[in-house]
Structures are given as structure tokens and as C-alpha cells.
Amino acid sequence: MSTLRTALTELVGVQHPVVQTGMGWVAGPRLVAGTANAGGLGILASATMTYTELESAITKTKTLTDKPFGVNIRADASDAPHRIDLLIRESVRVASFALAPKQELIAKLKAAGVVVIPSIGAAKHAKKVASWGADAVIVQGGEGGGHTGPVATTLLLPSVLDAVDIPVVAAGGFYDGRGLAAALAYGAAGVAMGTRFLLTQESTVPDSVKHEYLARGLQDTTVSRKVDGMPHRVLNTDLVNSLEHSGNMRGLVAAARNASKFKAMTGMKWSTLVKDGLAMKKSSDRTWQQIIMAANTPMLLKAGLVEGNTHAGVLASGQVVGLLDDLPTCKDLIDGIVADAIKRIDALGALRA
């Protein structure tokens, strides 16, 4: 089939300018390999994995695909340097970050031939990581799921494109060929999608949860600060409504309880959790209350996206959920998006007088 050659496809060595984001509890080997084999860039989510689990996930992904893929890493995690060493040792093609990695980590990855692609939410952040040597950035507008900002993609994307000279990947509100064509027209090098890939055959999210997503409309997401203290776009559920109307003390008690569960699940020491909290506070403007509340995120997402408990869990989602009504394979999804984008780009060319 025809394809689209962009700065992203040239940089990473993938066939199509389509990225599957590193969603916690969702982006595992099966989904990442499915995306890679379909010609896109799949990214493993390591924030909800122990170091040993990440090792296994990389090995498993390599048995399922020989195509390039990436790993998303928490730059403020205490073991981030060890995880970066693992990526280098395993020749992982892309390292992505939700928070800007330190300049020396970027340099180390680049020296080893790993492509560095942080996610950013403002033009000033894009300029900073570009000056530090980042190869590209992913910029997510407010329509996107999970942690998100207040500015729509249609405004945030051009502001970032005007600020940096490295490839920019657009995220937030993308799901079809029209979106890809529009992003390329803005000057982006491709699109990144989370919710759209969550709703595919290769996604390991329980079918009952997928159908919960498919039943939702454009008005069925909300941006809540009660999940972890930061703006978090999620599906409207009874739990989220309850959290929104609960007092701060109740949220802190729940967060402390979930921190204990996360510690038990990962085998982390309390000293490591505290060290990560200190790093998080140093790298952001979060209060200690927000940092304690951040313990909510892994366990609440796990309850919904892994255990299928939509009553006790949180379901991160972009607004695009209201436009989705199918569960395609990654290949059918990417092939369809690219073919439609090419058709629409060709149609635009016909408008010239």
C-alpha cells in the first residue's frame, strides 16, 4: 500500500507516521508488537512495571516483532538510569518520557543511537528539551486522555511547531485519516493516539471495559484533579463523580492506602517511594498533597483497565471516545488511517486553481 514519508518515519525507521502511546496497564508487548508489525511506532508503558517486568516485556516484544518500538520511562523515577541502561543494552529504538529527562540522560541515549522523544504540554517545554538534544517531541492537546492540559490541539500544535525545528508529533483528538491529514497540514510529522489504540483487538483491556468505552459519547469525559492531584481526563463514572464530591482528607486517606498497595505490588521499598516523591517534587510545582495523591493513579487505573472493575477503577480516556464504534486490528486501523489521509491530501491538491 501507499504510505506517507515524514520526518518521523525517517527518524525512527517506521513505515507510517502513526504512534501508539505508552498507556499504563494497556501498552504491553501484544499491543506494541501489533502496532509495530502494522508499520506504526508502538511504545511500551514501563511506569507500571517493575524493572524485571520491563526486562521481560522488552524480550517478549522482540519475540513478536522485528520492527522498531519504544519504551516510555518516568524520568523522575529513582531507577530511571538503570532502565535507560536496559534500553541501550537491548537496542530499543525509541525512549519516550512523560516528564523531561535530564540533559545528561538525553546525551547518553543519543550516544547509544536511541531516539529520544519526550512528551510536552507547552511550547516553552518543547524549546527546553530541543535545546537539550531531544530528537522529536509529542505534544498533546487538552482533548487527550490521562494527564492533560487546558489548551486544544488546534492551538497548542502550531505554537510548538513555531517554537522548535525538530519533528513534532501531534496528540489529543486523533483517530482517523482526516486527523492525520490535518496534523500533517499543520506541519506535524505524525500523530500519536492512545484511546484509539486502547480500543483495538490487540489491546489486553477486558472486553467488558472496551464496550464501556464504546458506549460513551463526546460529553462523557471529565478532567478531574481528584484522581492524583493533576488534571486527568477520564470517563465519567460513579467513582469519579464520588471523588469529585469528596473532601480532600478522604482523597488523601485513599491515596495513602493505594500507595501501600502499589508498594506491595511492585516490591518497592518505602525509601524508594519517598525518593521518587522527592524527585517528583523537585521536577515539578506539585504540593506534597498532590504527590501523595499521585499514588492513586496506578491502582485506580489497574482496577479499571486490568481487573475490569469499572465501579472501583478509573478509566483514562480522550474525548475522541465519543466518535469510536469499533474494535479493529492494529493493521486494519493503521492501514485505514493512512489510506484515508492520502485520499484527503490528494483531494486538497485538486482544490488548487
Curated annotation (Swiss-Prot):
The gene is ipdC. This is (3aS,4S,5R,7aS)-5-hydroxy-7a-methyl-1-oxo-octahydro-1H-indene-4-carboxyl-CoA dehydrogenase. Involved in the final steps of cholesterol and steroid degradation. Probably catalyzes the introduction of a double bound into the C ring of 5OH-HIC-CoA, leading to the formation of (5R,7aS)-5-hydroxy-7a-methyl-1-oxo-3,5,6,7-tetrahydro-2H-indene-4-carboxyl-CoA. Belongs to the nitronate monooxygenase family. It catalyses: (3aS,4S,5R,7aS)-5-hydroxy-7a-methyl-1-oxo-octahydro-1H-indene-4-carboxyl-CoA + NAD(+) = (5R,7aS)-5-hydroxy-7a-methyl-1-oxo-2,3,5,6,7,7a-hexahydro-1H-indene-carboxyl-CoA + NADH + H(+). InterPro entries: Aldolase_TIM (IPR013785), NMO (IPR004136). It is an enzyme of class 1 (oxidoreductase). Keywords: Cholesterol metabolism, Flavoprotein, FMN, Lipid metabolism, NAD, Nucleotide-binding, Oxidoreductase, Steroid metabolism, Sterol metabolism. FMN binds at residues 22-24, 171-173, 194-195. It comes from Rhodococcus jostii (strain RHA1). Gene3D superfamilies: Aldolase class I. It comes from the Bacteria. Signal peptide: none annotated. One of its GO terms (molecular function) is nucleotide binding. Disruption phenotype: Deletion mutant does not grow on cholesterol or HIP, but grows as the wild-type on pyruvate. In the presence of cholesterol, disruption mutant accumulates 5OH-HIC-CoA. The keyword Lipid metabolism applies. Pathway: Steroid metabolism; cholesterol degradation. Pfam families: NMO. GO terms for biological process: cholesterol catabolic process.
